[in-house]
Amino acid sequence: MDKLKIQVEVAYALPEQQKIIPLAVVEGTTAYEAVQMSGITHFFPQIELDSAKMGIFGKSIPEPKSHALREGDRVEIYRPLKIDPKQARLNRAKKG
């Protein structure tokens, strides 16, 4: 018997370019597997999948390799921070 397919999306964004890739995956597919299947690294080769932080609709998922997706989920791949948010606030406060 065929496994049930669910619709999900994989998203990645840079300041000048964004991409959302819709996918039909079998139920039980993990966030990590969906990102691999999406082929998003062809568009953004700088993504390091094994160390990339991921989330679902803005909520971080600590273990993308074991997080099973649900119908309609959007897997977001997060870029590393360039500067610590606390340091950025301090820098802005110093500038006045």
Swiss-Prot record:
Pfam families documented for this protein: Ub-RnfH (PF03658)
PANTHER family with a match to the protein in the record: UPF0125 PROTEIN RATB
Family: Belongs to the UPF0125 (RnfH) family.
NCBIfam families: PRK01777.1 (NF002490)
Record protein name field: Protein RnfH
Originating species: Hahella chejuensis (strain KCTC 2396)
